[in-house]
Swiss-Prot record:
GO molecular function, one term: protein-folding chaperone binding
Subunit: Heptamer of 7 subunits arranged in a ring. Interacts with the chaperonin GroEL.
Recorded family membership: Belongs to the GroES chaperonin family.
Summary of the function given for this chain in its UniProt record: Together with the chaperonin GroEL, plays an essential role in assisting protein folding. The GroEL-GroES system forms a nano-cage that allows encapsulation of the non-native substrate proteins and provides a physical environment optimized to promote and accelerate protein folding. GroES binds to the apical surface of the GroEL ring, thereby capping the opening of the GroEL channel.
Protein name (Swiss-Prot/TrEMBL): Co-chaperonin GroES
PANTHER family given in the database record: 10 KDA HEAT SHOCK PROTEIN, CO-CHAPERONIN GROES
Biological source species: Syntrophomonas wolfei subsp. wolfei (strain DSM 2245B / Goettingen)
Amino acid sequence: MKIQPLGDRLVVKVAEVAAEKTKSGLYVPDTAKEKPQEGEVLAVGPGAFNDKGERMPMDVAVGDKIIFSKYGGTEIKIDGEEYLVMSQRDILAKIN
């Protein structure tokens, strides 16, 4: 993947959700499931500028596992794969 986010944005590969099955054996369709809120950072922008014109460093790096806001980010598709492009402010926590 060749994509470089700008400013304080990053590209995230959303964690796969395992197929859910009810107690009676029925599979739950993707449209009925909660949106996943975990993923892996694949690309990071250079950071936003503060009021003094200085670039602020990003709090995450490529390879970090994160938890992000439920409705954070914009879905994109590259080479048949789905990703999210989001602002750093949409990140809630890093997973260690």
